[in-house]
Amino acid sequence: MWGSGHAEILELYRDELKTVMKSAGLPVGPHQIATGIEALREYLKDNPGVYVKGNVFRGDIETFRNKNWVVTQPLLDDLASRLGPRQSSTMFVVEDPIEGVEVGYDGACIDGRFPTVACFGYEAKDAGYLGKVVKYEDLPQALREVNARLAPAMAALGCRSFYSTEVRVGPDRKPYLMDPAMRAGSPPSEAYIELFANWDEVIWAGAEGEMAELRPAAAYAAEIILRSEWAREHFLALDIPPSLRRFIKVHGHCRIEGRDYAAPLGISEIGAAIGLGDSLQDAVGAALEHAQAVEGLELEFDRDALNSAMASIEQGREFGIEW
């Protein structure tokens, strides 16, 4: 069967992930476990700058930074109200910031094994993504080390799935795994689903525990997140040029009487425009062109998003991550 199996705990149970990382010999950054809103309040009052992450239940809380208590207090008041009787038992993982750049592996994992062709890239948080195809042996050392050390756990847990990592690398060159995605995350799945041309073969073989090698359709991919405030609570009608349908990925997509819509999912992000190319510049240019070609009510995107990802590429080189 295709899917993450029990390996989903590595993404959902962040406290368990820390334990697995330690056992696997991966570095673990300074962090605290806070059980209940009151324990979290007391810790955040004296610890500005830390990052707060939810545990187990996606949607209860999105990761946020505790800039200072004055700013954070209303958020916790609201969270306590929404959690109701669970507010005293909900667990939070609170992490100290780690200096460096965040890079990730994006591809598949079949019982702890990885295809010989891979993609890695940089995300502009909630705005865009840049990815590059390489031979697995040419992946940055930090990404290969994380995969190698997690592989036994993923094999034991039955992972046959899409798989991505967010790994922070800084001056000490150590690979700090921040979060794995044991699924087709967003981004970068909108991009890599087209960057490789034979996912049907990979999924079919992977479901049987066999490895079909990924076949690249291009050398680079770029992705730009599309959003609309209107789409939070309304069906968003989209005018997508027929020739670009392959490059516009819509969440909650439906077609009614020949027209394209994004169904309301309670969030402003409605999908992404992607671009492929034999050079990074070609991929970025194509993504921008495709994003500009789509029309929808209050539809917008960050035209500078990929500049941030490009800056991360240069910063990564300072820490031994060649692009």
What would you call each of these model-derived segments?
Residues 10, 33, 65, 69, ...:
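A structural signal for short, well-ordered beta-strand elements
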Residues 9-16, 127-129, 260-261:
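Short, charged, surface-exposed secondary-structure boundary motifs
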Residues 1-48, 57-58:
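Conserved N-proximal alpha/beta basic substrate-recognition cap immediately N-terminal to
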Residues 142-164, 171, 181-245:
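Active-site "cap" helix and flanking loop/linker of ATP-utilizing ligase/carboxylase catalytic domains
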Residues 62-185:
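Internal nucleotide-binding/catalytic subdomain
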Residues 14, 37, 68-73, 279-281:
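Residues at or immediately preceding the N-termini of alpha-helices
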Residues 204-323:
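Peripheral (often C-terminal) accessory segments that flank ATP-dependent C-N-forming ligase machineries
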